[in-house]
Amino acid sequence: LIIFSDEIYDRLLMDGVEHTSIASLCPDVFCITLNGLSKSHRIAGFRVGWMTLSGDKSRVKGYIEGLNMLSSMRLCSNVPSQYIIKYALGDYTKTDDLLLPGGRIYDQREYIYNALNSIDGLSAVKPKAAFYIFPKIDAKRFNITNDEQFVLDFLREKKILLVHGGGFHWEQPDH
């Protein structure tokens, strides 16, 4: 068993929520944890990231050898950008003011959450992390039978890009 954990949003938490790394919950299981600066530091174009291997490595030596071979053959890190990691992660305990009341990310989350829930036929759970919200749409009220077609029509008519629920393996056309 190998656990892959994408923890790119580990520092974008609000409302007192704390991140727990999957690897910390199962120290005897081999885990590959992926992370980076693109989300937490809002520098998407930098493409600065890393992969951490933890847990029991005794049964995955060949797999790790393959990862090392692949990384030495195919990866070409952006060396100047790699220098920023040490400084960006320097004070991991500091709360990002943008995630607190009055901060831009917090206030945007509040605005979009309240705006969506004020529209008849739409509802959403308030997100506790990241930049995304997954609203539920009353498919019968809005006559939606295909969520992919709905977002394409919405893009054409309103010039607003959405991602349909099916893009997240949601089976009903209501997200």
Placement of each model-derived feature along the sequence:
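Conserved glycine-rich beta-strand-loop-beta hairpin in the small C-terminal domain of fold type I
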Residues: 82, 86, 102-113, 124-138, ...
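Short N-terminal helix/helix-N-cap motif within the alpha/beta-hydrolase-1
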Residues: 13, 42, 172-173
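Conserved PLP phosphate-binding loop immediately N-terminal to the Schiff-base lysine helix
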Residues: 1-21
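Short beta-strand segments
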Residues: 4-7, 35, 50, 126, ...
